[in-house]
Regions:
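Structural and coupling elements of P-loop NTPases
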Residues: 1-602
């Protein structure tokens, strides 16, 4: 049985098609029955994953092919969710690296691949989207080889097998010019090149928890790979945590995977990936073992967070009108619940009881959490993201990121000038025949805060940017570019009127339309100059009986700029907050009253 088991993780850059490939493998192996074949990207089960088109949580699935059972784990491509990636690699024996046939390997591919090499895993390279116009498989393979070499791969890792595929059409082959009609060659390659798990199924039971799930019916569900022995339901075990203290527990159910379903099994043996229930207060990296032989496995390590934000109770005049959960106790309980399964997150008490400093791997990591809370009915105020500085050998250091930009060559000058002001250092520049250019930079992480929205404007929306944590380096003394413009701030509480907004739109770009309730201290728009301007958006036209009716001109308002959550977080300055409620995202000053702001600025 164990010889026919294969555990493999899938690595790919965002949008290179790994989730589509898994769907294709599930369907062609006959693991999925007809009823669930309709949905696309079956693996991305969470709402936000479908909307953003990214994978956030690592997922497991099992495929039966001929007599083999292949456990496949889908990993997130974003470095922001690197906490997920590192744990997943502890469960597998090889990785499937998926690369786009046009783009080649991108920085996030680099991040996950380096983690795989650290664990000594041998990759299989799949060049996907081979049917795209402009596919250049030979160039991509050279790039992959250079990438592996620069990451210090061994000779064995550099001698990687290559498969060409188009997941959308469901075909694969070892030669891009002669593809087979289905995914058979890929299944065969996985079976031939991935070794069966090297485990001892006769010794005392031992497994490490590498992911957690929660179900209100059975409580906490631990997911992990059995490293030794066998496991059946209703077994007594010892739970050893990362501080080596142990306690006893009893496993109630043991579940294996079949396709995307979890099915209860009577017995599971070493090498298989299973879920267990019945043990309270499980943590990631706990070891479950036979009480007679309680040996903990080494704890899993996760990279440190690099970005922090303050979450606070919403104290605006509109607090509590839209959300269900508004108190600091609600927010604290929700953050504590998130900490159980979101390993890369840290939460500390802020400088007052209703503030919490939440640190994560990047802006995306935290904005996904805020968006989830918003949908659950929470209201909160969120401050601008800040980078976390560390002291290394007596010197203050800050995180630096590797940034890769793909844009039209006509936009190159503007992008480079903007990055120059943000203290970016250019490492490489490659032009391709189609008039696009790829730029690589090393840039301080705080220089990237707020850059994405700027970048989209500079490249008219046609640029692609990706970045990943590179290293901690000395803090750069120079000032980084900040937002140049001030904002328009409301001086009164009330309903906005078209008459007032019409005269304000010459002063800058508005964020709010007519007939919307606003409050004093709320940000109405971006001022065209560098100072903040206090305005009255509720001013009505003075009516007199002198004028004849019908002489008023029609007021034409420019449509307002509406921010998404990420854009709002990037836009605000250090004295501003984003007010997040289930129905709206508002920008506001930390101090709502003008005389308080004046006093604070002295």
């Amino acid at each position: 049985m164990i010889e026919n088991l294969r555990n493999i993780a899938i690595i790919a850059h965002v949008d290179h098609g790994k989730t589509t490939l898994v769907d294709c493998l599930l369907q062609q192996s006959g693991t999925l029955d007809r009823k669930s074949q309709g949905a696309e990207r079956i693996m991305d089960s969470n709402d936000q994953e479908r909307e953003r088109g990214i994978t956030i949580l690592a997922k497991n699935t099992a495929i039966k092919w001929n007599d083999y059972r292949i456990n496949i784990v889908d990993t997130p491509g974003h470095a922001d969710f690197g906490g997920e990636v590192e744990r997943v690699l502890s469960m597998v024996d090889s990785v499937l690296l998926i690369v786009d046939a046009v783009d080649g390997p991108m920085p996030q591919t680099r991040f996950v691949t380096s983690k795989a090499f650290e664990r000594g895993l041998n990759p299989i390279v799949v060049v996907n989207k081979i049917d795209r116009p402009g596919a250049r498989p030979d160039w991509v393979i050279d790039q992959v080889f250079d990438l592996f070499d620069s990451l210090g791969a061994t000779d064995e890792q550099l001698d990687f097998p290559i498969m060409y595929a188009s997941a959308l059409n469901g075909i694969a082959g070892e030669d891009p010019d002669s593809m087979s009609d289905d995914m058979e060659p890929l299944f065969q390659m996985i079976v031939d090149h991935v070794s069966a798990p090297e485990v001892n199924s006769d010794g005392p039971f031992q497994m490490q928890i590498s992911a957690l799930d929660y179900n209100s019916y059975v409580g906490v569900i631990g997911v992990g790979r059995i490293t030794r022995g066998k496991l059946s339901p209703n077994t007594q075990v010892s739970v050893v945590d990362r501080d080596s203290s142990s306690r006893n527990g009893k496993i109630l159910q043991v579940m294996g995977y079949h396709g995307l379903e979890r099915i209860e099994v009577e017995t599971a043996e070493a090498g298989d990936i299973v879920c267990v229930t019945g043990i309270d207060a499980l943590n990631i990296s706990d070891t479950l073992c036979d009480p007679a032989a309680a040996e903990p496995l080494p704890p899993l390590s996760v990279d440190e967070p690099t970005v922090s934000m303050t979450f606070q109770v919403n104290d605006s005049p509109f607090a509590g009108l839209e959300g269900k959960f508004v108190t600091s106790r609600n927010i604290k309980e929700r953050l504590d619940r998130e900490l159980i399964h979101n390993v890369a997150l840290r939460v500390e008490q802020g400088d007052s009881p209703d503030k919490f400093v939440v640190s994560g791997r990047g802006e995306l990591h935290l904005s996904v959490l805020i968006e989830s809370m918003r949908r659950e009915g929470f209201e909160l105020g969120v401050s601008r993201p800040e980078v976390i500085q560390k002291e290394i050998d007596g010197q203050l250091c800050e995180p630096y990121e590797q940034l890769v930009i793909d844009c039209e060559s006509e936009h190159q000058g503007g992008v480079m000038e903007e990055l120059g002001q943000r203290r970016a250092e250019m490492k490489n520049m490659v032009q391709d025949a189609s008039g696009r250019v790829r730029l690589e930079f090393i840039v301080p992480a705080r220089g990237l805060i707020g850059f994405r929205s700027m970048f989209m404007t500079l490249t008219s929306g046609s640029g692609i940017m990706t970045h990943v944590f590179d290293h901690y380096g000395p803090v750069s003394k120079a000032e980084l570019a900040q937002r140049n413009n001030g904002v328009l701030v409301s001086m009164v509480k009330g309903k906005t009127l078209a008459y007032a907004l019409y005269s304000l739109q010459d002063r800058g770009r508005l964020f709010i339309e007519a007939n919307v309730e606003v409050y004093e201290g709320q940000i109405m728009g971006l001022h065209s100059r560098s100072n903040d301007l206090v305005v009255n958006p509720t001013k009505a036209k003075q009516l007199t009986n002198v004028r004849a009716s019908g002489t008023d001109e029609a007021l034409i308002l420019t449509p307002p700029v509406l921010h998404t959550l990420e854009q709002a977080l990037e836009f605000i300055d250090s004295d501003e907050l984003v007010e997040v409620t289930p129905d709206s995202i508002r920008l506001r000053k930390k101090l709502l009253l003008e005389h308080e702001r004046k006093r604070a600025s002295r």
